[in-house]
């Protein structure tokens, strides 16, 4: 099987990239990083600044879309990120389906938290 990062790029319909040097920008609103550590591979996307309101933070961290997607803070603690764990997923169709679902969730999160931060 080809490199999983190459499969992710194909699934997203973007040119192959050097994942050590670049992030992936989709539609000028979603920035995705591919993180490889040993045999594991994750997609990371910061989707909003860390909420100041504790209820918004609790809400964000309580969301759970699947066993593969989790929400957390970044290493610096300034942003909420969505992480997709693709470890152990080897078939192109499975990578594609999981990646597409992840992108749809990230877009929803960005919209949801933009509204919450404005008090809607």
From Swiss-Prot:
Q: Which UniProt keywords apply?
A: Chaperone, Cytoplasm, Plasmid, Virulence
Q: Does the keyword Chaperone apply?
A: yes
The record lists the membrane-crossing segments as: none
Q: Which InterPro entries match?
A: T3SS_chaperone (IPR013095)
An annotated GO cellular component of this protein is:
cytoplasm
Places the protein is found: Cytoplasm
Record's Pfam families?
Chaperone_III
Instruction: Indicate the segments annotated as coiled coil, or none if absent.
Output: none
Q: Which SUPFAM superfamilies match?
A: Type III secretory system chaperone-like
The main location is cytoplasm
- Which region is the signal sequence? none
According to the UniProt record, what happens if one changes residue 79 to S?
Answer: In plasmid pINV_F6_M1382
The role this protein plays is: Molecular chaperone required for IpgD stabilization and secretion.
Among NCBIfam families, the record links this protein to: PRK15202.1
- Assigned protein family: Belongs to the IpgE/SigE chaperone family.
Q: What is this protein called?
A: Chaperone protein IpgE
Q: Which gene encodes it?
A: ipgE
């Amino acid at each position: 099987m080809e490199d999983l990062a190459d499969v992710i790029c194909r699934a997203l319909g973007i040119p192959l990239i050097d994942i050590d040097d670049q992030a992936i920008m989709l539609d000028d609103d979603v920035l995705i990083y591919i993180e490889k550590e040993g045999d594991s591979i994750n997609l990371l996307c910061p989707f909003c600044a860390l909420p100041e309101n504790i209820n918004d933070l609790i809400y964000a961290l309580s969301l759970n879309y699947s066993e593969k997607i989790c929400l957390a803070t970044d290493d610096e603690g300034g942003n909420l990120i969505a992480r997709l764990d693709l470890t152990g997923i080897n078939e192109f169709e499975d990578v594609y389906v999981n990646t597409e679902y992840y992108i749809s969730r990230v877009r929803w999160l960005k919209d949801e938290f933009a509204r919450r931060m404005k008090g809607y």
